[in-house]
Regions:
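Bacterial N-terminal signal peptides
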Residues: 10-19
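Boundary at the C-terminal end of the N-terminal hydrophobic targeting segment
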Residues: 21-23
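Intrinsically disordered, low-complexity regions enriched in Ser/Pro/Gly/Gln/His and often acidic
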Residues: 2-3, 15, 251
């Protein structure tokens, strides 16, 4: 499935969009104790933001805004030295400890400062992760790696063809670049899935972005199972300069995978970095192997 949009979802996100969508319900405002929560691990493991709580296999967003709600969340989840499992490759890879809450501080949003202690993961640049207090299935092994040279070659042929199909010139396709390309195994079956974020620069005032999930079959053939193409021009960007997208702002990027509903298939968590906050998305594999977006929320930080 391929979608094309003129104005990307993540550049002009409204900061009022703090509740979940796709039939998910807001998390209850009162609680006797911490509920299972999934966090995005950002800035090299030095900061977290909440993505959703988990209840009966469903995701729900927290509503921030009222001071009492914000303080309640911080007291439940952001107490100094509180510890969470750090998820990398769909399995636990060390821990993440809270240093201090940023809720109520200038541009702190719903975040907290953290310290990560990983086993294998190297959280640098746009390599991010998840953290959670949910019960983790310790019987499944972590799987997250860079694609092989052959795999990358096959994927980039698909990416180039998709950009051309969407109307990009041959010269523009030659400017092919990426922010992320990662191999994962969502079903623990030894057949990798690939999550990628590619872009081209047809002109100095235009960028074209492609986010995708690709599959590899038993014969080694790779094909897209989901992709989203966006055309971005200066008027679509809050800063008015498309070059700001070259750093990763405005792109949908992988966080990690986690089987939050215990159905044996890891869901894919992504982030869309915007100028005033972050968009978060979750994809779930359905019948027939198709991927669909089952959850979406926005975390406002401060005005641009």
């Amino acid at each position: 499935m391929t979608n094309t949009t003129k104005t990307p979802w993540l550049i002009v996100a409204a900061f009022l969009f703090t509740a979940s969508v796709y039939g998910q319900k807001p998390a209850p405002k009162s609680s006797a104790g911490p509920k299972p929560v999934i966090f995005a691990v950002l800035d090299g493991g030095k900061r977290v933001e909440p993505i959703a709580s988990v209840s009966a296999g469903k995701l729900a967003a927290y509503e921030f805004g009222e001071e009492v709600q914000n303080k309640a969340f911080a007291s439940l989840y952001y107490k100094p030295k509180s510890s969470y499992s750090l998820i990398f490759g769909g399995a636990a890879d060390g821990t993440l400890a809270i240093v201090k809450s940023n809720i109520g501080t200038e541009c702190g949003g719903a975040s907290a400062d953290t310290v990560s202690r990983t086993v294998k993961a190297k959280l640098t640049g746009l390599v991010m992760a998840l953290a959670t207090n949910t019960k983790i299935n310790t019987s499944t092994a972590a799987y997250r790696r860079k694609p092989s040279v052959e795999e990358r070659r096959g994927i980039e042929k698909l990416v180039s063809a998709e950009f051309a199909k969407q109307g990009a010139s041959a010269a523009a396709v030659k400017t092919l670049r990426y922010h992320n390309l990662t191999a994962l195994d969502v079903e623990d079956d030894g057949q990798p899935e690939f999550i990628g974020s590619y872009w081209i620069a047809p002109t100095s005032g235009e960028r074209r972005l492609l986010f995708f999930i690709a599959e590899q079959d038993a014969n080694g053939k790779i094909q897209f199972s989901m992709s989203e193409h966006s055309v971005v021009k200066a008027d679509d960007v809050m800063s008015g300069d498309v070059k700001d997208l070259d750093t990763g702002v405005g792109h949908e990027l992988l966080l990690d995978v986690l089987d939050y509903d215990a159905d044996g298939v890891r869901e894919i968590f992504t982030i869309g970095r915007a100028f005033e906050g972050n968009n978060y998305y979750v994809y779930k594999r359905g019948e027939g192997g198709n991927w669909s977006k089952v959850y979406e929320t926005y975390s406002y930080r401060c005005a641009f």
